[in-house]
Each structure stands twice: as structure tokens, then as C-alpha cells.
Amino acid sequence: MSRLDQKTVANRYARAIFELAQEDGQLDQTYQELVSVRQVFLDNPSLAPLLAGVDLGIKEKQALVDQVKEGASKYVANLLQMAFDYRRMSDMVAIVDEFERRYDEKHKRVHAEVVTAVQLDETRRNQLRDNLAARLGAQEIVLNEKVDPTILGGVVVKTANQTLDGSIKTKIEQIRRLIVK
């Protein structure tokens, strides 16, 4: 029996819980819970290997899973238990990432990494959000801001699908290439 790759596993599990939560009107709650579960795994990088490894017995592993499931809705609790039962705990972050991708697509939400030479103030941040939303056809833009003085000015925006480079550094390089020709 071949082991499925992580992307295939994440797609299947995420699609299943997404469809169930959507049918039951629990999509927003399930999303919030899964983001919290993902954070548990990210904050405790040894958790997934511990649950997948041989250092703990099955009862100790189940006790850890039960702690993560504590307070979770039936969908999230069932997902965690199924991932544990089928030895897919190492895929949990990927499963939540895929669920979030589906959630974002449904809500027309785009995550954008924004690089500027200086920190954006609230006015410029809101202008950038509005411009990106219009350009990308999104209802919501989630910005992950980074400051990099080497771009000299302007802004570089990276989304899952594209990169928009309006940095002064790139414009100078383009002019330099034209002059050298």
C-alpha cells in the first residue's frame, strides 16, 4: 500500500471537513477552531513527530490528542481523531492550510505579503488594501507586512498567484538594462 503525498492527503481531509461544516452552517466556527489547532502544532513543533513516533505508547498519544481536541466542535474533534487513527497527524498543518485556502476562496479573501522600504502608516495600509482588493477582485486583503530598506521605495506585493513589483530598486534595474542595451 503506497503512502499518499501530503498535498493529496491535505486536499482530501480539508475538502471533507469544509463541505460538512458548510452544509451545517459551521464554516466560520470550524475555520476559527482549525486556525487554533494549526497554531498548537506550530507552537509545539515536536508534537506531530511525537504523535507519529515510537517514543510514546498509544494511550499516551491518545491522551495528547484528547487534550488538543478539548473544547473542539464535533467536526474538528473528529478530524483530529481520524488524523490520529490513520497516522496523519504530521499532515495537520497542511490540512488546515488547505482548509484555509478553500475558506479564503469562498470569501474572496487574498493573503498578500507586502514589502516596503519603510513601515506603512494606517492610511497607506488602507489605501493599499483598497487598491489590491480592486485589482485582484477580492473582498478582503490580509496583509503580511515586511520592511526591507534595500528596495529603496515603492512596494512589492506577493500573493499566491502573482508578484507585483513597484519597487524603486526594480525600476532602477530596468532603466539600467535599457541603457546597457
Swiss-Prot record:
Gene3D superfamilies linked to this entry: N-terminal domain of the delta subunit of the F1F0-ATP synthase (1.10.520.20)
The keyword Cell membrane belongs to this UniProt entry's keyword annotation: yes
Keywords: ATP synthesis, Cell membrane, CF(1), Hydrogen ion transport, Ion transport, Membrane, Transport
Organism superkingdom: Bacteria
Membrane topology: Peripheral membrane protein
One CC-aspect GO term: proton-transporting ATP synthase complex
NCBIfam families per UniProt: ATP_synt_delta (TIGR01145)
Chain's role: F(1)F(0) ATP synthase produces ATP from ADP in the presence of a proton or sodium gradient. F-type ATPases consist of two structural domains, F(1) containing the extramembraneous catalytic core and F(0) containing the membrane proton channel, linked together by a central stalk and a peripheral stalk. During catalysis, ATP synthesis in the catalytic domain of F(1) is coupled via a rotary mechanism of the central stalk subunits to proton translocation. This protein is part of the stalk that links CF(0) to CF(1). It either transmits conformational changes from CF(0) to CF(1) or is implicated in proton conduction.
Family according to the record: Belongs to the ATPase delta chain family.
Subunit structure comment from the entry: F-type ATPases have 2 components, F(1) - the catalytic core - and F(0) - the membrane proton channel. F(1) has five subunits: alpha(3), beta(3), gamma(1), delta(1), epsilon(1). F(0) has three main subunits: a(1), b(2) and c(10-14). The alpha and beta chains form an alternating ring which encloses part of the gamma chain. F(1) is attached to F(0) by a central stalk formed by the gamma and epsilon chains, while a peripheral stalk is formed by the delta and b chains.
Protein name: ATP synthase subunit delta
